[in-house]
Each structure stands twice: as C-alpha cells, then as structure tokens.
C-alpha cells in the first residue's frame, strides 16, 4: 500500500479510530515497559508478524468483510518488505501510561477493532437498504441496535480470541522461516526468541488480568462472570447472538441477491445516494415493472415502496393485514407488477381453498368454480396443490382423478403437466427407495388411467419396472397399483395383464419374499377371480366425462424429464388484460354465460339475459347471411353451453327440488323450452336404468311453469313415430319416464291418440315401447284403477288406436298383444265384440229375407216358393265352394259315426224296433231344434199337409233301415268273433294314445242316428243351426268324458292282481336293503370264518341265508309301464297340438288362454296361422 493512499484515507477513518481507541486506551499497566524496549529494537519485524496474524483472523471470520475494512485494520502494521507506514510513535507510547489490564496487548485491540469495523460495515449496508423502504430502515435500525448491544459480549471472548491469535502467530512465524532462504541461523534464532517472548508476555498478562479484582472498564459485570463460564458456553452464546442478528435481515439479503435491479444499484455508486433514486427511476433505470418509462414517471414514491414490498420474495407476508389491504387498495393499474402479484396470490388462495373442499358429491360444482378463474395462468399452482392434497389424503384419490379428468377434457395441457410431474415424482421415489411416495404417486396414476387421462402403456411400464426387481416394497407397490387399475387393464389388454400375473405367480412359488407380501399376492389373485368387484375402475357418480370427449396422453417413463417448476413462480405479463379477456371468453364458451355467478347456480335476473342469443337475433343473422360478407358460426356454441350447464346441475344437486329451483332461475325464452325439455329427456335416456329423479323433476317443473307441458307432449308424439331409431335401453327409460308423467297428471292423457296398434303398423320397437309403458302404468296405478281410467268417457276417442273396434282382425291383434304382455284383463270389452262380430252379418241377411217374404202378397206363393228353392240351391253351392266350417264338421261327424258303428257291432246287431222308434223321436227333436233356420214354405208344408209328412217320414225310415242293414252285413263279413278280443285291445291302446278321438267316438246310438239324419238334412240348415247343435254336443261331450274316466278307473282296478301285490311286498321285505345292518354284518363275518350262517327260520333251526336280489324281469316290467305312461301323455299333447296347428310355445299360451280368457286366441308365430274361437 502506498503512502499517498494511506494519507488520503486518514481523515475518513479518524472517527472510527477514535471510537475504537476510546474504549481500549483508558489506562496503563506495569508490564508495558518491556514491550516498549522491544518495540524500539525490533519494531518492523514484530509488526509485520502482527499484520499476518490480523489478516488470518479477519479471513477466518464467519461473515465477509470488504477490502476497505481489511486495509483499515492492517494500516498500523508494516509489510514484510519493511515499509513503515503508520507506525505508532514513541510519544504516544510514552504518554499513554494508563492502559488497563485488558488493553495492554495489541492483538486484543485488533480484535475489538475488527468487531467495530464489522459494525461500521453493517451500518453502511443498512444505510444503502434504507433507500429502498421505510420498513427496511426500521429493520436495519433494529439490527444495528442489536449489534451494539451484543458487541459487549466481545469482551467476554477476549481470552479465547487471544489464544487463537497466538497459535496462528506461531504458524505464521514457522511459515516465514521456511520461506526465507537467504537468511542465516541468526535470523531464525531471533524469530524463535521473539515468539517465545511474545508467548510468555501474553500468558503473563492473561494471568494478571484474571488476578485483578477490579478494572477501570465500563463492562464490569461481564468481566466478573468470566471465570464461571466455559469457552463452549461462550461460543454457543455468540452463535445465538449472531443468528438473532442475521434473522432480522434475511429477507433483505435474499432480495439483494436475487433481484436484478438491486444488484445493479450495488454496482453503480450513483444509487448509493438516497436523494437521486427517484430521479433515476423517472429516467428508466431500475424499472422493476418492466413497463414503459412514461407510466413509471407517474408512480409516486409511496407506490414505489409498496411495489418493492409486494414484488419481493415474501410478497408482502411480513406486513400486517390492514397495511397490506391499504397497499392493495392504492394499486389500480392492472398493467403493473404489483397488481399482478396480488392477483396471483388471490388465485393461489382460491385454488387451495377449492381443492380442499372437494368430495364425491361436489366435484362438478367445484370444477365449475375452478374453471371460472384463470387456471391456465395458475396451472403450475393447480397441479402442485392437487398432488399435495392427494398425498395428504390418498382415500380421495378417485375424486381428484375425476376432477383432473374434467379439466383435462377442456385444457389438455394441464392434464399433461400434472401427469408428467407424477411420473417424475414416481421415478425419483423409486430411485431413492421411498415407499410412501411411490405408493401415493402410483395410486394417482392408476386412477388417471381409469379416467382415460393416461394411456394404458404407462401403467404396464410401471408394473414391469416394479416386478423386474422383485423386492418386498416393489411387489407391494405393484399389488396396490394392480388392484386400482386391474379392471381397466383387463378390459383393454387382457393378454399383457395375464403375463404380469404369471410373473407374480412365479415370484410366489420362489418363496423369497416376506410372508406378508406372499399373502398379499394370494389376495390379489382372489380379487382377480372375483372380477375386481370391490375395486371398480370408475364409480357411477364420478363418471362425468364421455369417452369421446376425453383426451388421452401417451407418455413413457423415459420421455418424461422436465417437470416445469418455473410455472409455480410469479412471472410478469406485458399483455395481462388481453389474456384475461381471452380466458373469460373461453370460460363462457365452456361453462355458459353464467360463469361469473359466485353461488354456482344457473343465474337469475340480468345474468340470464346473456344465456343464449334470442330467436329474433338468430333470425336476423340468418337473413343477413347472404347480404353481409361476415362469417356466421352455425355450430351453436351457446346451445352446447346450455346443455353443459344443465348436465352439470343435474349431477351436482342432491334432490329434485333443489335442482328444479336452480333450473327455473334460468328464465329461458320460448324458443329454448323445447331444447330444455329435450336435454332432460336425453339425460334420462342415457342412464343405465331408469332413475325416478328425472320423473319427479319434470313433474315439479311442469307444475311450477305450465308452459313446459306442450313441449313434452310434442316430444312424446315424435318418439312414438321414431321408436325404430332408439335402442332398447333408451326405449325403456323413455317409456317409464312418460308413464310417470301420465300417472302424476303432469301431462294430459290425450297424448295416447297418436298410438295405433294394428297388425300392419306393428313394429318391434313400438311394441317394446308400448309394453314397458303400460306395464309401468299398471305398477303405479294397479290393474283395477288403470282399467277404470281407460273406460272413462273422456278417453273413449283417444284410445281408438290402442283398442280398435272397426275390424275383427285388428281387434284380435290387440287382444293377443295385451294378453301376451300379461294385461288381458283390459280387453274384456273387445272379447265380447269379437263374439258378436261374425254372427252379425248372416243374422242381418236372414232378417231382411224374412221381412221381404212376409211383405209379399198371398197370390204369388207358388212363384215365391220356386224362387226360394233356387236361392237355397245357389246358396248351398256357394257354401260347398267356399268350404264353410259347417260342412267340415259334418264330414267329421260322418267319420265319427262310422268308427263308432264298427266299434260296437254287438249293439248294432241287437237293435230292436224300439230303437227305430227312438231314432224317429230323435229326428223329430233335431228338426224341432232347427225350426228357426228352415224357410217359411217348408214349415207351412210340414204343418198344413199331414199326408206329405207321413209319406216323407216313412220314406226316411225306410232309407235309414236299408243303410243300416247294408253296413251291418259288411261288418259281419269282415269281422270274425275270434278276432274280436284282439281288435278291441288295439282300439283301447289307440284310445289311450289319442284321447281327443275317443271323446268324439264315444257317442250313444241315439246320437249316431241323429247325426245321420242331420247329415241328410244339413244342406237345408244355416250357420245359426249348426252353431246351436255344436253347443248341445259340447255339453254331451262333457258328460261322456266323466263317464269314460269312471270306466278307466274300474278297468285299472281289475288289471291289478292282489296276489301279485302280496308277492311284491314279500320280496321287498326280503331284499338286502331292508335287512338290519347288525344282522348283515354278523352273517358276513360268519361266512368269512367258514362257520354256518347265524340266521334261523321260524322253528329255530339254523339255515344258510342267501342275499336276495331284485328280479330283472320285474325291473323291466316297471320300466315299460313307466315308458307307456309317459308316451301316452306326450302323444296326447302332440296330437292335440298338431290338430290345432300350433307350435310348442303357442300351445302353452293356448292352454293358458283357455283357462283365463276362454274367448279367442290367435297364434303370433310366423309359421302357423291359427285362430281359435271358443
């Protein structure tokens, strides 16, 4: 250092040297004489050594000191080259005799000087910080006062610092000896002696300082307590004071290090002057906000101070809440950094608050509130808070995953960022063997795979990574991961999941893992067998995003490297206002125009005015489309927004009453009501099963506002016409929905007039709709009340399509349809109509003919008779051509009569004249029964001409006798008495196989004669007579059936032989299985030993007992009897079914209809066309 530099710095450092010497040079001691003489001789050598000691002490300090302070400390001591700068004068040494015991040695003075220099340096730094803010001035003042208070503790540690300085001085001397090559032995000895003298002198003075009981210094109490304290305690106290001293200025140090403008001020000396700071900011230097210099010129000094506080690392956290609010209220410029930092802090608080409130029921509401705020700007904070919340509460992982799925469907970059951070977190935890972090992160990734946010490849990569190195922790993490997303992976890629389970099976068979982990693997296999029923991929209440609307990210473990942690920090935005406006427009498109509502409801009053564009506006836009060259958006974004808002409210509300109140707040226009009703119906149809919530909601809405009734009616009519466009699940949900509306009278029953149930218009989809619709109504109302409702006069016209009365074919179809769905009781009136319908046509024609005949005059009787005969002949010819059912029945009667005559030869041979007379009587009865159908001419001829009557009677008798005789002769020729028994047996077996034929064959002789006579006269009978004869014959068949049953029972009793029954019972008693177990075992043991059997007969004699076995012949006989019975039953059913022309399914329906509704039946099968009239 040059002398000029030292002289230039002398006046600047006068006050510091005076202040430092004021506390230390207050007295003198006796040990100073030897030091004087020593300094006179070897001043330069000693001071150069002291200079090195001081430099080492300064460099080893825990805090840093600038170069100026170091030079000031070393000014008194010369360098090694021997230049004596600022040496202490002899006069000053001689005059100052009143040194105290503590200030006799120069190293001690130097330590105090270093502390004082340190304090002065800190004060300079505090003065620099004082220019920034008043709060920094206060903190600097407090730290300065603390430093002055704690400087007293430096005197306590003097002894310890002296010892340190001695040891360092010795080391420096040795170093100088090694480096000095040119000096001889004398120089080394002088140095050694100097060091010894120095050590001795210092030890002497330390001892003398301890021996003194009283000192002249200001700090007596601290010196008195010195001997009682250990050096370790003193060191800890010093460290504590240093910590307290540094705590006050931590924030300022960080700000000095990290803020670029403040670094610039440190370099530039111009900023050290407090008066020129405001002027420089106006010029554009140190512009913290990064805005234009003109805007910064308008900022006041107070605003600048608040800006420095808010843009610091703490963000104003060290201020009181009132002061922070005042500062925030003063800032109104949105382009400033202070305003942006305040807005960012508010956004962070909102995000943390909403995420902490999430649960299963409130996911939709909270995501909607999150989307209102600018989450694109705060995406880093959002991802960080979600990951942190999931780590603290892993039980809500599926809820957070559902929320991320909703956000990812609208902002895929946020979902990708969160997934990347989770993957990086998992990789770091896997590398550090952190099991807890691995479990939480893998759990979250599994649920994101379930929600289709992450691809399945990522899950498979994680599983393979964990199972490749099978430790206890890795296998446990893999098991928990598989439990959560196993169902989804088996659905998507079952083969790869099967390979992973095979690897787990091999690990289990090796047996190297812990027993607990082995048991977990077994449990996992059991869960897989059960189909993951306790670990579903997605709960129904959290399935909020459709599969087509979701964006799936394909990430790999190796590709993800950078988590983008910079997004968590504040960053100034030059275009803050424009970006915020863009996001508001985007949120309106996503959430609808009610995104600004704070309560999450659907708006009310003025807010609902911007819900959708009015119909008039839309029309004007369409009209002006071709006139103006502007592009019109016809994608209907407002309509999509309305659908989204309604869907979110339906999923967020707890009950239908709350939902109805929220939906009614929208105050929709008339053109929007149809769309609103359609959205409700679509939401109901999309459910897996019908939910009563939608029916109750629509009923409440229709009662609150009756303008919604007409749109629902129109929708019902449209659905009835377009049922073929819907699948079965939607049809069932919609039909049950409208059934609920009709039951609650939310809409009128006049809607049913659009349904027409005919064979021509019948479609399977429409039949399914009507079936589920009517079955749901019957469940609500009951069959009795429902039938009563349908029979009211008001609904007579509306139900004409469902219950037609114009055509028998349509009547029959409606009856068959409702009976097939289990609602045949509704169609009683139609059944009665169907009975009357075929009889109405012939009866009217006959009545007209009768009236015409009665009105004719008596003179034209002959002509009318001839004309009537011709008419009858023509009618008979037409009947034969058309093959009426009456003629078929007559033919069957002929066939039946022939069979019965052949079966009863004996009775036919033994006929007497009495039988002939009885046949005449029967003929007369049949004629009397058919009087109504015979014409008036035939009746008059029979009544008023007895001769003709007798002649006709005799002729009829003769003809019948001749016929019977001819038939009897033929039967006697063909049939011998020897073959009678065999043929009768065959006939009995045939009768068993075909009981329907038997019932027709078993008729009395009187019936046979009457049937023959009716055949001869059937040409002259009408349909009404044949129907009456059928009714009479039906009654006779019932009596014949009861008679045949009795005969069968009697014959069965005769067939059974009593002796055979006794034999069978005896054999059963003697069988092996009825013998007691004890006797059986005893007999077997005796036979093994060779002894005779122990069984005895009735007289007490022993005899060998043979084990009886069942005879094969008896077993065969029973089997054959069982087969016969079974064959007879089946044959009778098949015969009846084949005769009726029904399939097997419809035969069962036929029997049911005969039991419940014995009126009509029509087969619905495509193959068979059969109509049955009872």
From Swiss-Prot:
Residues 1-15, 80-92, 183-200, 235-259, 910-924, 1103-1118 have a biased composition (Basic and acidic residues). Disulfide bonds: none annotated. Transmembrane segments: none annotated. Residues 641-757 form the MI domain. GO terms for biological process: cell differentiation; male sex determination; male sex differentiation; mRNA splicing, via spliceosome; regulation of mRNA splicing, via spliceosome. Residues 36-47, 93-102 have a biased composition (Polar residues). Keywords: Differentiation, mRNA processing, mRNA splicing, Nucleus, Sexual differentiation. Disruption phenotype: Complete sex reversal to fertile females because flies exclusively express the female splice variants of transformer (tra) and doublesex (dsx). SMART domains: MA3 (SM00544), MIF4G (SM00543). It comes from the Eukaryota. Residues 348-531 form the MIF4G domain. It is found in: Nucleus speckle. Residues 1-51, 80-109, 136-259, 840-1045, 1096-1133 are annotated as: Disordered. Pfam families: MA3. Residues 167-180, 201-223, 869-909, 963-1001, 1034-1045, 1119-1130 have a biased composition (Basic residues). Belongs to the CWC22 family. The M.domestica genome only codes for one male determiner Mdmd protein, which is encoded in the M region, and can be located at different loci on the genome (chromosomes II, III, V or Y). The M region contains a cluster of tandemly repeated Mdmd copies with only one intact copy: other copies are degenerate with large truncations and frameshifts and are assumed to be non-functional. The presence of multiple copies in the M region may preserve its integrity in a hostile non-recombining environment. This protein is encoded on chromosome III. This is Male determiner protein Mdmd(III).
């Amino acid at each position: 250092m040059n002398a000029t530099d030292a002289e230039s710095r002398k006046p600047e450092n006068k006050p510091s040297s005076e202040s430092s010497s004021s506390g230390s040079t207050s007295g003198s001691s006796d040990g100073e004489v030897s030091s004087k003489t020593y300094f006179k001789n070897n001043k330069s050598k000693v001071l150069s050594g002291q200079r090195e000691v001081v430099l080492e002490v300064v460099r080893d300090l825990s805090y840093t000191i600038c170069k100026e302070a170091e030079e000031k400390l070393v000014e008194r001591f010369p360098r090694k080259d021997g230049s004596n700068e600022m040496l202490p004068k002899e006069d000053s040494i001689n005059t100052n005799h009143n040194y105290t015991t503590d200030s006799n040695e120069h190293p001690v003075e130097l330590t105090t000087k270093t502390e004082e220099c340190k304090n002065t340096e800190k004060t300079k730094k505090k003065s620099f910080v004082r220019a920034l803010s008043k709060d920094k001035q206060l903190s600097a003042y407090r730290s300065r006062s603390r430093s002055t208070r704690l400087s007293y503790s430096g005197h306590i540690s003097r002894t310890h610092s002296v010892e340190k300085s001695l040891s360092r001085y010795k080391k420096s001397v040795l170093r100088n000896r090694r480096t000095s090559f040119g000096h001889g032995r004398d120089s080394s000895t002088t140095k050694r002696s100097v060091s010894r003298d120095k050590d001795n002198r210092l030890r002497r003075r330390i001892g003398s300082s301890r021996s003194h009981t009283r000192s002249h210094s200001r700090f007596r109490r601290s010196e008195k307590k010195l001997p009682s304290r250990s050096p370790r305690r003193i060191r800890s106290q010093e460290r504590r004071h240093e910590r307290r001293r540094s705590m006050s200025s931590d924030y300022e140090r960080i700000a000095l290090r990290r803020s670029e403008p403040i670094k610039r001020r440190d370099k530039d000396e111009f900023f050290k002057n407090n008066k020129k700071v405001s002027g420089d900011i106006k010029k554009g230097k140190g512009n913290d906000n990064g805005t234009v210099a003109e805007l910064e010129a308008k900022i006041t000094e107070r605003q600048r101070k608040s800006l420095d506080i808010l843009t610091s690392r703490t963000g104003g956290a060290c201020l009181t809440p009132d002061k922070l609010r005042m500062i925030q209220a003063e800032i109104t410029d949105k382009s400033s950094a202070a305003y942006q930092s305040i807005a960012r802090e508010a956004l962070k608080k909102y995000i943390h608050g909403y995420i902490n409130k999430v649960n299963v029921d409130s996911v939709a509401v909270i995501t909607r509130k999150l989307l209102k705020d600018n989450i694109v700007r705060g995406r880093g904070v959002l991802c960080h808070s979600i990951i942190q919340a999931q780590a603290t509460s892993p039980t809500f992982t599926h809820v957070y995953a559902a929320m991320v799925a909703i956000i990812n469907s609208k902002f895929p970059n946020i979902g990708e960022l969160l997934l990347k951070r989770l993957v990086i977190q998992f990789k770091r935890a896997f590398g550090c063997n952190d099991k807890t972090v691995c479990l939480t992160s893998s759990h979250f990734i599994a649920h994101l795979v379930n929600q289709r946010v992450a691809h399945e490849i990522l899950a498979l990569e994680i599983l393979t990574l964990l199972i490749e190195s099978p430790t206890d922790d890795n296998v446990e993490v893999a098991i928990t991961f598989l439990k959560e997303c196993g169902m989804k992976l088996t659905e998507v890629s079952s083969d790869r999941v099967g390979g992973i389970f095979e690897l787990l099976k091999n690990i289990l068979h090796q047996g190297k893992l812990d027993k607990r982990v082995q048991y977990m693997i077994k449990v996992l296999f059991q869960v897989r067998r059960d189909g993951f029923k306790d670990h579903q991929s997605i709960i129904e209440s959290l399935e909020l995003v459709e599969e087509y609307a979701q964006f799936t990210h394909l990430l790999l473990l190796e590709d993800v490297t950078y988590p983008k942690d910079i997004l968590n920090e504040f960053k100034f935005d030059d275009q803050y206002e424009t970006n915020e406006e863009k996001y508001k427009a985007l949120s309106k498109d996503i959430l609808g125009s009610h995104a600004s509502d704070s309560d999450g409801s659907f708006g009310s009053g003025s807010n609902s005015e911007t819900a959708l564009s009015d119909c008039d506006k839309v029309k004007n836009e369409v009209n002006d489309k071709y006139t103006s060259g502007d592009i019109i958006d016809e994608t209907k974004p407002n309509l999509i927004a309305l659908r989204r808002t309604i869907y979110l409210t339906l999923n967020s509300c707890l009950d239908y009453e709350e939902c109805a109140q929220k939906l009614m707040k929208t105050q929709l226009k008339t053109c929007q009501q149809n769309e609103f009703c359609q959205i409700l119906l679509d939401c109901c149809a999309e459910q897996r099963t019908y939910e009563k919530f939608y029916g109750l909601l629509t009923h409440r809405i229709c009662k609150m506002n009756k303008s919604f009734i007409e749109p629902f009616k129109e929708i019902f009519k449209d659905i009835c016409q377009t049922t073929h466009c819907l699948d079965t699940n939607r049809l069932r949900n919609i039909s049950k929905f409208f059934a609920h509306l009709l039951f609650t009278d939310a809409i009128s029953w006049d809607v049913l007039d659009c349904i027409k149930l005919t064979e021509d218009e019948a479609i399977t989809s429409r039949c399914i709709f009507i079936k589920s619709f009517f079955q749901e109504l019957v469940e609500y109302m009951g069959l009795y009340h429902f039938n009563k409702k349908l029979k009211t006069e008001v609904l007579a016209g509306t139900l004409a399509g469902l219950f037609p009365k114009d055509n028998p074919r349509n009547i029959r179809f409606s009856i068959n349809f409702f009976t097939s769905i289990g609602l045949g009781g509704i169609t009683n009136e139609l059944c009665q109509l169907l009975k009357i319908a075929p009889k109405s046509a012939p009866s009217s024609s006959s009545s007209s003919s009768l009236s015409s005949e009665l009105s004719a005059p008596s003179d034209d009787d002959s002509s009318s008779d001839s004309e009537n005969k011709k008419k009858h002949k023509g009618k008979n010819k037409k009947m034969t051509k058309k093959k009426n059912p009456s003629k078929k029945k007559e033919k069957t009667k002929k066939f039946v009569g022939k069979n019965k005559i052949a079966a009863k030869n004996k009775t036919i041979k033994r006929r007497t004249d009495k039988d002939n007379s009885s046949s005449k009587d029967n003929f007369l009865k049949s004629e009397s029964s058919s009087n109504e159908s015979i014409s008036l001419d035939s009746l008059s001829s029979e009544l008023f001409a007895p001769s003709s009557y007798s002649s006709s009677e005799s002729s009829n008798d003769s003809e019948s006798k001749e016929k019977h005789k001819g038939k009897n002769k033929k039967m006697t020729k063909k049939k011998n008495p020897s073959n009678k028994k065999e043929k009768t047996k065959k006939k009995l077996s045939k009768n068993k196989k075909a009981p329907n034929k038997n019932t027709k064959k078993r008729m009395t002789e009187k019936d046979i004669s009457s049937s023959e006579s009716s055949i001869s006269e059937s040409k002259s009978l009408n349909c009404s007579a044949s129907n009456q004869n059928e009714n009479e014959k039906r009654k006779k068949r019932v009596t014949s059936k009861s008679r045949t049953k009795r005969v069968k029972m009697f014959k069965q009793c005769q067939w059974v032989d009593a002796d055979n029954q006794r034999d069978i019972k005896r054999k059963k008693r003697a069988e092996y299985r009825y013998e007691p177990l004890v006797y059986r075992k005893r007999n077997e043991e005796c036979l093994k030993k060779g002894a005779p059997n122990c069984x005895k007969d009735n007289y007490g004699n022993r005899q060998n007992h043979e084990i009886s076995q069942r005879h094969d012949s008896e077993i065969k006989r029973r089997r054959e009897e069982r087969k016969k019975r079974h064959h007879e039953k089946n044959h009778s059913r098949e015969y009846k079914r084949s005769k009726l022309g029904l399939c097997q399914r419809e035969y069962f329906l036929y029997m049911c209809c005969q039991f419940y509704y014995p009126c009509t039946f029509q087969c619905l099968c495509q193959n068979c066309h059969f109509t049955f009239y009872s």
